[in-house]
């Protein structure tokens, strides 16, 4: 697009962005400085804000608003603004956005579905290797139940598949969609089967697995609500040897029922990254958890930055501008950029590989030591850099017997 054409599209854009969006300056600075209006003396601005404390007065003259999940975007926030032309959330969840209100005002909205799915899957894997070491568990003998077969559940499924760990998926929405697609194909006589091939099971079947990992959005009401999906009734049916991992939304588990269960002496092993009532967590529950963290499962550098990239692409599309940047332009090398493996794959090697990139015990320790002095949001804002497996290149020597590291997401040496 020629710069003169751009000047007609963009007039002194004020882009407001959450201060915790990585590479926002790099992605968006040129978009707000393109040429600004016919007189040429207006300047666009790129303005960071603190997500939890954003006010209507602050964003009264925003053209573009880019948030994360802690900012409620609704009439209360936007009633003073009459020029907003784009709202983006650099997150997978959208329950903090009043999409009906935005639609009523014809304000385009974009989120970043799947942006941190890999990060969350790697958090779960790190938790599993930590608990396997702590309790001498053979991961290959466990069955994992995944609640939610969307982006995050699918990435976890892929990693478990790479490790040969048996797992089951419960997702009634996807199961219904699968059945409907099969009906349509049969009715149309379509010889090519394009349906989702996965076998979905009931919630009861998943809750009987050795490990239960939750990956659903918060849904209140409707045919398949997830609000307090795990409650007193089904939590009390779990047995002492099970592991429960929640890295989705805090309201999916009734935290008070979970606390009552543990106070009664139940042996359930709990990994909690999300909490009811964030940022105010049920403090009494923390000592009963194996791993406790501050809603950071999706906080890898890649996961957060992918959200910035997806919103940049969406805004470029709306402005009819060719995207100039991609995430690879900005990602730094990992602290250990490459390793060579000359042994056969084993749980010991898995333990070493996962912890080398991300040891969830670091975040658990920070949470327990600093929650009461720093606060929940501060732990998220000041989260230390964490990379995904893909940041590390793994070379396999010829005598190794499997490419599991690459199937887990570690990079291959480019030829």
Where in this protein do the model-derived segments appear?
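Phosphate/diphosphate ligand-binding glycine-rich loop within oxidoreductases
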Residues: 63-136
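Phosphate-coordination loops involved in phosphoryl transfer and adenosine-cofactor binding
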Residues: 12, 84, 140-143, 241
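NAD(P)-binding Rossmann-fold cofactor-contacting core
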Residues: 163-181
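Oxidoreductase and adenylate-handling cofactor-binding alpha/beta cores
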Residues: 121-137, 162-163, 309-318
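Rossmann-like dinucleotide-binding domain for NAD(H)/NADP(H)
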Residues: 241-244, 248-412
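Glycine-rich adenosine-cofactor-binding loop
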Residues: 19, 113, 121, 140-161
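N-terminal glycine-/charge-rich "phosphate-binding" loop or analogous flexible N-terminal tail
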Residues: 6-62
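Rossmann-like adenosine-cofactor binding region
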Residues: 73, 176-283, 409
